[in-house]
Amino acid sequence: MNRRLLLSAGVAIAAAVAGGYTFMGRKAPAPAAGPAGGGDPVADLMQLQLPDLAGASHSLAGWKGQPIVVNFWATWCAPCVREMPELDALQKKYPDIRFVGIGVDSAANIQKFVEKVQVSYPLWVIGAGAIDTLRKLGNPAGGLPFTIVFNADGSINRKILGEIQPDDLDKTLSGLKA
């Protein structure tokens, strides 16, 4: 059976089991309404307040005017884990581009994970309730990993479902203007 299909099925089952709840039984944060209240998924993502591993809240809106690479991942996702060192190397190569890993997992699992595998870019937690967010952003299966490259003006440059190809992503990043 196709590995991507298996991964997507696993994510869908996890989402169904989680029922929209994140770590410690809290309801997943609801995305803010878009500028006109129309539910623009990119605007919603930019405004979404997400905790880092220390519990401090952040949003992508804080990086307005800068190119951003957002990587949705999970500790249990083998392709996600494989691509993290490659994303870390690209982040170091392009210091003017903001990178963030948004964990579709619990803060406790991510904390244990980073004790073994460290990255230099920030990791935020969205929890299992993220599947809806992923779908709205153009990932109908809600599969992981899922990477979105944003231009400095906040528009989407490209979406990558599945493991990144470092040389391919490098070409995209080299063309971004800060």
What is each of the regions a protein language model found here?
Residues 75-82, 146:
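C-type cytochrome heme c attachment motif
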Residues 124-126:
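Short acidic-hydrophobic, aromatic-tinged amphipathic segments that line or gate anion-handling sites
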Residues 53, 63, 152:
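Short, ordered coil/turn segments that flank beta-strands lining enzyme active or ligand-binding pockets
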Residues 116-119, 128-174:
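Thiol/disulfide oxidoreductase modules built on the thioredoxin-like
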Residues 59-77:
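Short active-site neighborhood of thiol/selenol oxidoreductases, capturing the structured segment around
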Residues 81-118, 128-134:
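Structural microenvironment flanking redox-active thiols in thiol-disulfide oxidoreductases
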Residues 63-66, 96, 119-120:
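Active-site acidic short loop of glycosyltransferases
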Residues 1-47, 178:
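N-terminal targeting signals for export/organelle localization
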